[in-house]
Swiss-Prot record:
Pfam families: Cpn10. CDD domains: cpn10 (cd00320). GO terms for biological process: chaperone cofactor-dependent protein refolding. It comes from the Bacteria. One of its GO terms (molecular function) is metal ion binding. Heptamer of 7 subunits arranged in a ring. Interacts with the chaperonin GroEL. This is Co-chaperonin GroES. Keywords: Chaperone, Cytoplasm.
Amino acid sequence: MANIQFRPLHDRVVVRRVESENKTAGGIIIPDTAKEKPQEGEIIAVGNGALDDNGKRVPLEVKTGDRILFGKWSGTEVKINGEDLLIMKESDIMGILG
């Protein structure tokens, strides 16, 4: 895992997509053009948390290294250090795997 020089703000996280299998269970190879973008990823950076109505910081439930599931249209695609990543709010994350 490369060390990125980027820290998201508030309740945002930086996610690296986890690539899916190139082959089906039956052995059929799926070409890149037919693949959907994976909705699974690994968190590589987290913000400090959002502020509540009283100005108190609310820490994030996810941490660096967590494997997550997120919605199909979640996040903003960015390129950091030549790597395609997603920046999304913690609320866009559906759950933590494992």
